[in-house]
Amino acid sequence: YTLLYTKHTELKLGLFALERMVQIMEMTQAGMVYADRYQQVNGIRKAAPVIDYQFGSLRDDFDFGSVMLFQSEVFKKMVKTTKEDYQYAGLYDLRLKISQKKKLVHINEYLYTEIENDTRKSGEKQFDYVDPKNRRVQIEMEQACSEHLKAIGGYLEPCFQSVNFSASTFEYEASVIIPVRNRIRTIRDAVRSALNQQTSFPFNVIVIDNHSTDGTTEALRELCTDHRLVHIIPERNDLGIGGCWNTGIHHEKCGKFAIQLDSDDVYKDEHTLQIMVNAFYEQNCAMVIGTYMMTDFNMKEMAPGIIDHKEWTPENGRNNALRINGLGAPRAFYTSLLREINVPNTSYGEDYALGLCISSNYQIGRIYDVVYLCRRWEGNSDAALAIEKVNQNNVYKDRIRTWELQRRIQVNKIKLKPQKAILQLIEEQTHSWELAKQNYQALEEYRKQMKKMSLAGKDFDMLVYTFPNPKRILSATAQTD
């Protein structure tokens, strides 16, 4: 067995901890085992449990703890299969390769104590992956993840469905969707930010007031003097943020495009809505994601500043989306499609689930200029989460990834069936038909003479690749009887 310790500080193993890890390894025949642990922070010991590894646990920052035990034979074999010379993604690549062949088993027992020096709150750690100084790291992580997806059949080639925006008619071109519960300190700012938008099209603001009790409802009623504000109090009392979204997008007054605005955030200026809607048409996409700036309650910029998700690429963004923990904000959707999918009725990860689902078929548009201000304050639901809540959230997102990855693999299998049948037919013919065999062999040689040509017309400009194939001139003497 091979034990890997990823910290540089003192490690204190529990009584018979290594023996227990070996025991579980032998019982499960896992490729790797990892365990819950204690963390010592400023001299105080606290429990730091980890979570089970799932098929879709593709985050490169998945928390295994600092102690991992590997089967040495599996470890060496997977290292030998690695062609890339990674500087940063070596361990991530190794774990993905091992997961293709063996299980990664979580021992939910506290087997060691580690010294923890990163004492930042959960709300501060969640943006590490978009820090510009980590860009080289992220490029390697994306490469490793993409290779893993190709190996397991979950990789999607950059082919997308087009969107027909004239398929349905709407009274409004756009609707700003604001779910809210008990945000009396911020709801007026959010609604006014939406109503102040200047656009070339009609829009409205749909606020789903999820039974507020702090004066939010009364504040919204005061703002309803503007006829563009639609104030909805749901009949149901079991709705999360996703359920509130479903209530809004299925409302008869919802516009063609549904644009997010959280109840404690604001748009950067009066042009955000126009910019978001324009992007749908300019990029022919079913979902648009903008760029936001982190601010304090008074809307002054604070670290980490601008979050633009420039790791996204049109070609590989939807594959890399399975690795990263978020897609950005604000998010906007083509309402007709969103009504078909519906939003998971949760208050965490519902937007991420939509992004994965939509991107599997359609292109996601991007805006890299700041259009949104995300206010961080003590009232944020994710400002400082307990480890148990962080784990709960991560389990759910990993489950979302697992479901989406399983779906993508099934779709790829269906797509490959006709191609496999064609290749099988060609293989059978080249074995039983000598002339066909000779012609295919000759074709491979002719391909080596391929040339690139540029063709330009009145309305088009394209590159054409040509190569000679004189065997096509001759009859293949095929018989049809």
Q: Where in the sequence are the language-model features?
A:
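A conserved acidic beta->alpha catalytic loop
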Residues: E10, D209-A219, N237
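Short beta-strand-to-loop acidic/aromatic patch adjacent to the donor-nucleotide binding site
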Residues: Y1-K12, G255-V266
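Conserved donor NDP-sugar-binding/catalytic core segment of glycosyltransferases
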Residues: E10-A47, H271-P304
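A recurrent flexible, glycine/aromatic-enriched loop bordering the glycosyltransferase active site
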Residues: K46-F70, E311-A332
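Glycine-rich, basic loop-to-helix element that forms the pyrophosphate-binding segment
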Residues: Y1, E235-K253
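Acidic donor-binding loop at a coil-to-helix junction in glycosyltransferase catalytic cores
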Residues: D85-L94, S347-L354
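Catalytic beta-strand/loop signature of glycosyltransferases that borders the donor
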Residues: V105-N117, T291, G365-V371, R376
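Short, acidic, metal-binding catalytic loop of nucleotide-sugar glycosyltransferases
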Residues: R192-P202
